[in-house]
Structure formats: C-alpha cells, structure tokens
Amino acid sequence: MERSLPAKMAKASLLLLSCLSALTFAVDSSAQSTGFLSPVPRASCGANDHPESGLQGQVPAFLRAAGFNGFNCNLELVGQARGDGANWQSAEYIDRADRKCAYHGTSLKTANRTTLGVSVVDISDTANPAVLNHLTTISMVDPWESLKVNVPRQLLAAVNARNGNGGPEIDIYDISLDCRSPQLLSSLAVGKADGSTGIPATIVGHEGNWAPDGLTYYGGDLRTGGGRYYAIDTTDVRNPKLLAFWKPSVAIPHGLSVSDDGMTGFFVAQGGTPIASLTNPAVAPTNGLLVYDLSQIQNRLPNPQVPQIGQLLWKDGSNAQHSIPVKIGGKPYLIFVDEGGSGTGLSSVSQATGACAASMPPFPMARIIDISDVRNPTLVARVTQEINTVKACKLVLPDITGLSLFTYGTHYCSVDNKQNATTLACGQFNSGIRVYDIRDPLHVREIAYYNPPGTTTASPGSDHVRNGGWKAGGPDWCSSQVHLDASNGTLWTTCQDNGVLTLKFTNNVWPFPESSTPPGQQN
C-alpha cells in the first residue's frame, strides 16, 4: 500500500504493506462456476406500454437497423431537455425555495457544440425541464464521473477528469441559495509541489465522491503511478488540500462510497480476468470490492494511513464502477456495479464473445452484497436481465456486431433511500433505465423499464458520439445515475444522446408504501 508520507516515513509504510499482505480476503467462489447466472423476473407491463419484443434487456439487430423506436414498461416519458446531450454523470439538489435542479456533464469539444461544461437544468416542472446555463471552470468542462452533490453542506464538486487526462484541480460550488445559479467557491490544484495545497503529490481526476459529512472528497486516479485513490480536505471549501493518497492492493481505482460515519470506505478494484483464464481456478480474480478503514483520514490524524480490512473479488464482471452502502429491512448491504462483463475490457464484441465461449456472463451487472461484517463481505444477489445468460449469447451477439464497447449492461445505479432501500434503479448501455424491487434482496424482481428511442441526429455533447459508437437510430447509452422521487412517482436521469429525461411510473407499480426519497440518500 502506498502512503502519502514524507520520505522519512517510508519504512513504516513498507511495514504496513507487509502486514496487509498477510491478510486473507474473500473471493466469490460462486462466480467461478459456469452457467450460474439467472435473470431477475420480468416486469409485468400495462396494456398501453410498448414492451420489449425479444429478450429482457435486448434491442434486436433488426430493430437497430430499422431505427429503434424505444420500449417502455410501467414508465412513460413526461419531459425532455436534450440540449447538446450528456455524458457520464448527473447530480441533483433541491434548494431552500424547493427548486429542483439537475446537473450533468457533457463531453469535450466536438463538432456543432453550442456550450461546453456542466449543464444546469431546472427540473422543478417535470414536464418542462429547462437548460439554464453551464459551468465552465476547469473541472466542470468535462468532470467525467466525478460530478457529485453533498446535501448537508449544500455543495457541488468535481475534479478535473477528462477521462483521466485532466489534472489535480477540484472545483467546488455553493448551491444553497439558488440551485439554478451555483456560486464558485474554489477552483484549485491540490497537491502542489510547494505544499500550499496539501501534501505534495501528483493526482489526476476521473471518479470521485463525498464523505457524507462533506468534509472530505475522495477521488480515483486511473493514471498516476499505476493508479491511486486520494482524499481532499474540504473543511475550508475555499482552500481544499490534499490529505492522503494510496495505491489499491489489486487492480486500479475507480468509484467509491463512504459509510455514514465516515470511518469505512467501500472502494472498487477495477480489474478483470483474461478470457483464457476465466475458468482456471488457479488464476485469482482482480475485480471487485476493497474495504478500507478511513478513520485516520476522518479524524484528521497526521500522516493518515488507510489500511485495507476486507475484500470480495469475482471473475464474472470487470471494470468495477461504484458502490452504495444501504440498509434493507434494517440490515446493511452494499449495492455494487460493474461496467464490464466477464473478461477484460468494456464489453467489446470480442470480450462478450470470449465470455460466452467460457460460459460466463458477457455483460456487466449490479450486485447486492451483505456487509454485516465489513471484513468478510458476502454476495447475496446478482441483478441482471435475460441478455446476460449464457443461453442468450447466440441471440444477442448479432445485436452488437460493429460496436466497439459498452454494448450492453450497467454503469450507474441508485436507490430510493439508503437508510431503508426498497428500490434499485440502474442506467444501462443499450437497455435503458431498469427499476427493481429489492425489498427482499434474495428475490429481486424488475418492476419497470424505459429504453428511449434512438436519436437520428448526433448530440455533440455525448461521448457516445465523440468516441464513434453512436449510430443514427441506434439505442442510447443511459450511463448516469437515476434520481427517484417518491412524492410524485417520477424519476429523472440523462442518456447520452437523449439528454435529460423525466419519467413517470404508471400502473401503480411505484412507489411502494414504505418507499421514500429524502435528499442526499439515493447514491
């Protein structure tokens, strides 16, 4: 483990590393067997819905070729603000005047752009979401997956990401008075060599998240020194400082979450297993969950250490994305999401084909993990559709022919209330928005979905367009978090080509009697 210590502390750092290497952590052995996966039960759709015509989660090749018109089941479109499109992340805040605002990233400059930066969208009227302005400070030009709101301190922040090609800056905005007009508090590079912004170190943005109290922002750097996690002290929001950085014990960093008390971190190991080794029990998995003791950072001890205290890794997924600590029926669980299927990579055609040949699920999925004992997390459930079963391979592989990456599967998920989670909502590549009943985590069931129509013109703020994956009339990448509202039975999210979408549940499927959506408790 790499520690953010002066050179005189290097020996102590090596001692910590040797102690950690002696610990034994868990491997999800069930994931190493073949043909294990079962899909969740399908949603029962209403008479006026347009349900999927093939497998659950599938957009068949012939529909793509003809121009995909969308599917819906118990969810219907209420409003849309396409703008220039969107990219990877979205966030929400409701201010003291009860105005609801959406924030979402857009890609770096592409042809026909009108405005760069994070879009500020008024979604108070769900039928008429309106893009008001854009945030264009250095980290907001392309925050990638780091754009996050902290509700207790009423702050919006992002790091300079640009898909890991950014820099050490963090931008922090005050959104307390009027969420429609964020006020810049700081835009600073942390870790400067002169020590003026915390310990001297090189970091580059990509992913990130707040500690619940808003006093620390944690980031995942994919690039520097083979990848490192880092912690920024945001106690003084006008003068953020780098507190610590460390290298994960396996794979590279990505997303993360922190327990309510700030003491425990549920960080991801973004790894994968070569196709040839998927069924080889002698090859250990490198993708999954790393549990850290964050107490020394939370308590602001000098030269904080970040020991790893737990682990759960698997082979039936790769490129671990993020986690959400929740309680279901009073018991602690972790929602965990991958963005790649079995193998290595981002669900390319070759990866999916190889996974199918190994009788492993080809696409990424969400998982529910029991964290009653954070030192020994255990898998409870896999949450996925029929497209991700081995027997479906021959039917879905033709759908993705000619695509480069992110062909099917999860990216981000949210719950209704982390303190009493009843509902899981996930944005997926090509399969749209999927919503699940998780009140019984052993028997998850799908209750609704909405897969938007393919766009026929390019959205210049979409990374789906920027990286060449967009095809006119093809299905969208719904890659950002989903934001539920139990007070009126709606949700909003962004899909990269379609932009901001506001949706309403129909046929009385949601909210459940015990569902609630308090601010700041969804992801």
Residue ranges and their predicted role:
Residues A26-A31:
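Boundary at the C-terminal end of the N-terminal hydrophobic targeting segment
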Residues Q32-N523:
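Feature marking well-ordered beta-strand scaffolds used for ligand recognition
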Residues S13-T24:
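Bacterial N-terminal signal peptides
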Residues A10-S13, Q89:
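Residue-level detector of intrinsically disordered/flexible regions characterized by low predicted structural confidence
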Residues E2-R3, F25, D122:
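Short intrinsically disordered, low-complexity coil segments enriched in acidic
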Residues M1-M9:
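N-terminal secretory signal peptides that target proteins for export/translocation
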